[in-house]
C-alpha cells in the first residue's frame, strides 16, 4: 500500500494568509493579473495587507479597450505600477505572415499557437528572475481547473512556484468581496461577460452557461485553456505544423 499524499501546502488558509505566507517565503514574488475579477481581488488584498508585489499583465495586442481602461483604473486606485508585457514583435509578425490575422478561428491548434505567441512566451520571459507568482485561478472556473492547488510547483516554468490564493473560492465569494470593499472591476462584466480575454476570442454568456463558455466558443474541444494554466491532465497534444 502506497504512502498517503502529503497535505497540500496552505490548504484551508484564507487568501490573505496565503499571500502573506508567499510574500515572506519568496523574496521575488509577482502577481500576474488578467484584470478579471479574481486578480482585482488579489490586488486589493495585497494593497490592504501592505504586500509589496510586482503586478504584471499581458497585452496580447488583441485586448478590448475596456481592459486597457481597467489597467488605468487599477494604477489610479492603488497608486501602483502595472508592468504591461507585450509579445515579441518578430514572433507576431511570423504568426500573421504564415497564418493570417485571425488564425484562431481555423483550428484549435492555430488558436493555441496564437495564445502561445501572444501569451505563454511573453509570460515566460516576464517571470525570469522571480521565485513565485500569484494567480487568480479558481477550481470552480472550469473542469480543467478543478484540481488546482493553492501552492504548487510550476510545471510550465521550472524552478518557480505557482500560488493560487483563491483556488477554493466560489464566484459568489469573489463578487461578495468586490462589493464589500468597493473593488474596481472590469466593465465588460456589466455587459454579460463572465470570463474576459482577447476581444475576438471572448463573448458574453447566457444564463446557465459555464463561466468560460464565452471563450473560444466556436471550438468543440472541452479544454478551454490558453496555455498559461496547463496541467498534466489537460495539456493537449503538441501543436501540429500547418503549411
Predicted segments — roles?
Residues 1-243:
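Nucleotide-activated chemistry modules centered on ATP-dependent adenylation/adenylyltransferase
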